């Protein structure tokens, strides 16, 4: 009985001191890809409206869930989750895609400067317009950003499929998540590769967003080119099922 314990002790003593301390300080190991939390931990609920409800307004199921939370363990909220009224998941995703080298502070600063530049340009246009034209000018940079991305989203894409030793570009309908990703990728690529040397990123990005908002610009042209290629390869559409 003592032999296995002695062999285990010798293996542990052979490790370096730092490795032994790191192993001993590991949290409880689970079977789900070394998760930090055990299966009994619950996901956090980040919703101010839920916590503002009075107990008398809760349903029986919500009251039971509230009693369970008093004795259950709750996971820590992720650093990217927030209950702020200014939180926007689409802008957050765009900021992450624009980030380089993990410098998220710089990416957030560029995004804030871009939205500010969009608003300034629209207000200059608003003040110079007549009373009739002012009603048609959008000044909210968040609405302009979302509408510009929607205008850049392609409906149909091309997927390479191998048939007979050759790759064919087969047109397929794109999911919403893929459409949004391509629109963001094209916008960021256009601003990085075709930006004048002395032009700052917020200035270029704000210009491209306003162009896309009015269905103009190189990003819109790139979307139309993809649609034309999909239309030209419509004879290969049946390769999706064969």
From Swiss-Prot:
It is found in: Mitochondrion. GO terms for biological process: mitochondrial translation; ribosomal small subunit assembly; translation. GO terms for cellular component: mitochondrial small ribosomal subunit; ribosome. InterPro entries: Ribosomal_uS7, Ribosomal_uS7_dom, Ribosomal_uS7_dom_sf. Belongs to the universal ribosomal protein uS7 family. Component of the mitochondrial ribosome small subunit (28S) which comprises a 12S rRNA and about 30 distinct proteins. This is Small ribosomal subunit protein uS7m. The gene is Mrps7.
